């Protein structure tokens, strides 16, 4: 069983990493290709492409200029410790034990516009490049064309020793589109998190993102390798709604008082 998460736009490179243990991303050469494309853009072009403010565009232009194919403790941080958004508030990797992180290293992957796919302890240099960005590149019109089957094939490598290969999709729709189901040698299960609001259950973005991180942490702490055990997930008041779920879409619901 492998869990995939989306990355986060916000990053924390100020807090020192709680472990020195690290690995290197699998697709550094491919990332360098994208950096070459991004370095040709002015801050104004970056702002227009990514729909971000002038200060953010300038920051990311600097990040692309500073990016190096040589990853060091000075310019990099482990991915799961560097990402700092709603999902990662739920995951809270900084409070995971060392053996938890090692389990995550085997069973958790983070999809990335720049890096393709990351292990939790892969060193990562700061960047912003959302998977849905329409960045023309030598391989096509956008990042889905750039990554092609590569991310899916990398995931397939993880399933070679797995009798019942299951990919648990805790990523956003934008990011999961880089995974090609027809190429993937695994069954896909997508947990969906709904909250009660205005007389009905609905997906509320902030809560749903945090819940994805909470479920990833739950799987790590409980050493879950059989996805069926995820149905017992009950963190923060969520409960599996069997009647509204099917084999591929698992619904978890809660009512906040």
Swiss-Prot record:
Pfam families: H2O2_YaaD
Family: Belongs to the UPF0246 family.
InterPro entries: YaaA
Recorded GO CC terms: cytosol
HAMAP family noted in UniProt: UPF0246 (MF_00652)
The name this protein goes by in its record: UPF0246 protein Rpic_2164
Biological process, per Gene Ontology: response to hydroperoxide
Organism: Ralstonia pickettii (strain 12J)
NCBIfam families found in the cross-reference section: PRK02101.1-1, PRK02101.1-3
């Amino acid at each position: 069983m492998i869990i995939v998460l989306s990355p986060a736009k916000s990053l924390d490179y100020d807090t020192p990493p709680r472990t020195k243990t690290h690995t290197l991303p699998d697709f550094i050469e491919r990332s360098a290709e994208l950096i070459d494309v991004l370095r040709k853009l002015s801050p104004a072009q970056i702002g227009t492409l990514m729909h971000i403010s002038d200060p953010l565009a300038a920051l990311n232009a600097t990040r692309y200029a500073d990016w190096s194919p040589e990853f060091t403790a000075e310019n990099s941080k482990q991915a799961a410790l560097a990402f700092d958004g709603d999902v990662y508030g739920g995951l809270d990797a900084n409070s995971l034990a060392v053996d938890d992180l090692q389990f995550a290293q085997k069973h958790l992957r983070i999809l990335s516009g720049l890096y393709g796919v990351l292990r939790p302890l892969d060193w990562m240099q700061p960047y912003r490049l959302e998977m849905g960005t329409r960045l023309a590149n030598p391989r096509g019109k956008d990042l889905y064309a750039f990554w092609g089957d590569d991310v899916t094939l990398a995931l397939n490598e993880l399933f070679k020793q797995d009798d019942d290969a299951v990919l648990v999709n805790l990523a956003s729709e934008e990011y999961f589109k880089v995974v090609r189901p027809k190429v993937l040698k695994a069954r896909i299960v997508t947990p969906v998190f709904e909250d009660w609001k205005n007389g009905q259950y609905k997906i509320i973005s902030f809560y749903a993102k945090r819940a994805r991180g909470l479920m990833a942490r739950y799987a790590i702490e409980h050493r879950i390798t059989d996805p069926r055990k995820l149905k017992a997930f009950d963190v923060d008041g969520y409960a599996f709604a069997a009647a509204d779920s099917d084999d591929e879409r698992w619904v978890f619901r809660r009512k906040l008082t």
